[in-house]
Amino acid sequence: IGMGLIGLLTAQMLKANGCQVIGVDLDQSKLDLAKTWGIIPFNPKSDGDVVKFVENYTNGIGCDGVIITASAKTDEIISQAARMSRKRGRIILVGVVGLNISRAEFYEKELTFQVSCSYGPGRYDENYEQRGQDYPLSFVRWTEKRNFEAILNAIAAGNLKVKEMITEVVGIEDYQKIYGSIGSSKSIASILKYNEIQRNFEVNVTINPYIKAAAKANIGIIGAG
């Protein structure tokens, strides 16, 4: 739910891993882009009730998982996610929505709800991010760093399309054009372009003075065996 930048990236990753993906958004242009990648588009403004659509599409089963990447104050989104989920399905909140959850909707289906914490394990851990203390791969397979590596590998392999999502390039001096209308803009991804500045770099190399070896060797022996 929510086909902005994060939603489109998420949908592509799911599709690349063999999932059937339904993308829900009110912006038809974003849905049209998602459709080119094999994602099933649904616009509640023109297509009707998304819960009924999911029920019909899944033969009455419901979604295995619902990932919310939308940003809205309404509680209706979390309610829709619960109603379109199958029994014992999973709901992951990546975006920001109202969380006045109906106990009955979650209780009757035994749904699992989780809030995603940014990039993954290691985020906000000072030892990990500042001191480079990694988590053992055998215990924590997908850390913040390994998640980024997987994304970069997916882009390199062509499984994750990012160029098509860049809708505008703005000079750094005009940054307010992006941030001033970020809530109402139809743009998906914006690039801030910095002016190229010629700089002269000086490299200083410090050479330690040559130390001549002593004429007479000194040997120390530890252990009387």
List each language-model region with its residue ranges.
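Mid-domain Rossmann-like dinucleotide-binding core that forms the NAD(H)/NADP(H) cofactor-binding site
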Residues: 1-47, 52, 225
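Hydrophobic alpha-helical scaffolding
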Residues: 24, 44, 71, 137-142, ...
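Residues in the short beta-alpha loop(s) of Rossmann-like NAD(P)-binding domains
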Residues: 27, 97, 119, 196
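Glycine-rich cofactor phosphate-binding loops and adjacent beta1-alpha1 units
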Residues: 32, 40-114
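Short acidic-hydrophobic, aromatic-tinged amphipathic segments that line or gate anion-handling sites
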Residues: 40-46, 166-174
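C-terminal capping/lid region of NAD(P)-dependent oxidoreductase domains
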Residues: 60, 65, 92-96, 111, ...
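C-terminal substrate-binding/catalytic core of Rossmann-like NAD(P)-dependent dehydrogenases/reductases
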Residues: 101-164
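Phosphate-binding active sites in nucleotide-utilizing proteins
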Residues: 218-225
